[in-house]
Regions:
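Bacterial N-terminal signal peptides that target proteins for export
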Residues: 2-15
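Bacterial N-terminal signal peptides
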Residues: 14-22
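Sequence/structural signature of beta-propeller domains
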Residues: 26-312
């Protein structure tokens, strides 16, 4: 459960332990690392300690403000937060004119000279939603508390019935929104137009499936059977600023799918990705490339939560 104000001493203790473990290079215990994936390096960029940042499930690096990350919670009342790369909340924005069901991911992009944020209301744990929404908001020029209204929204459905989706990314150069299913095995990749010509309900196009998703080994299943079955559920996705890599986060792993120039995503995700273990997170839910494309930021739900910068 998220830490509340009466438990600040406990939060501080946990935060201290996380920092100590990270600085010591042991964010995961040896018994936890049953796989031998050669992974990227990671460092602690900051800690999320603010009670308002207690269920972060979406993260996007600002291209407008240096060292600023946009975030939103899974639960709550539909707010966007601007935070420093150290984890400090800088401003809070309320989104008017939208009905919020289950926000699960977000992305930052530039289209025709306009810098924007996309918020994905695509969560569906129960598999009951007939339609889902994506909201595009112009990125605020000032980091001051304010109310925002979407520039446009997209209502869509899946082609063959409901599914849970927590991973959404934007390929602005190709005018595409990419969506990855959470619980299907193998994970499915879908696409939607970033700027549809009309306002009707769209149907997402199935692009393909993601190759190379790790499977739990016998030892991991024996030690933690419930967790092992969830480790490959997809919780976030991001396209690099140069459009050359799709990053996919699960509860345990980071997968990187490089793409050749002019190659379609269906081909890129059909090849074995670069796979590595994530640094420790209480519940890995949020990921995006840094604005310069040199690394990725990752964090998770609950507080305190570490905010990592990962260098592939």
């Amino acid at each position: 459960m998220p830490c509340r104000s009466p438990s600040r001493s406990r939060c501080a203790l946990i935060a201290g332990l996380v920092v100590a473990a990270t600085l010591a290079g042991c964010a995961r215990t040896p018994s936890d690392e049953t796989e031998n994936f050669a992974g990227p390096s990671s460092r602690l960029s900051g800690m999320l300690l603010d009670p308002q940042l207690n269920e972060i499930s979406g993260l996007a690096a600002s291209s407008r403000h240096r060292d600023v990350l946009w975030m939103h919670n899974d639960g709550g009342d539909g707010r966007l937060f601007a935070a420093s790369t150290g984890g400090r909340r800088l401003a809070t924005f309320r989104i008017d004119g939208v009905t919020r069901t289950d926000w699960e991911d977000m992305a930052a992009f530039e289209l025709k000279g306009r810098r924007s944020l996309l918020v994905a209301d695509t969560g569906d744990n129960g598999g009951l939603r007939r339609t889902l929404q994506l909201h595009v908001i112009e990125e605020p020029a000032k980091l001051q508390n304010a109310r925002l209204t979407p520039a446009w929204s997209i209502v869509f459905r899946w082609p063959d019935g409901p599914r849970d989706c927590e991973a959404v990314a934007v390929d602005a150069a190709r005018g595409q929104i990419l969506l990855v299913s959470k619980k299907r095995n193998p994970a499915e990749l879908f696409a939607l137009p970033l700027r549809p010509p009309g306002t009707g309900v769209l149907t997402a196009t199935r692009v393909g499936t993601l190759a190379g998703m790790p499977e739990p080994d016998a030892e991991h299943l024996r030690q933690s059977p419930n967790r092992a079955r969830l480790d490959s559920h997809v919780t976030a996705a991001a396209v690099s600023p140069d459009g050359a890599t799709l990053a996919v986060m699960t509860y345990r792993y980071l997968l990187l799918y490089p793409r050749q120039p002019r190659e379609r995503w269906v081909s890129a995700v059909s090849r074995t990705p670069d796979v590595s273990l994530l640094p420790w997170l209480p519940q890995a839910e949020a990921l995006d490339f840094s604005a310069d494309g040199e690394g990725l930021y990752a964090t998770g739900e609950f507080i305190p939560a570490p905010l990592y910068r990962i260098t592939p």
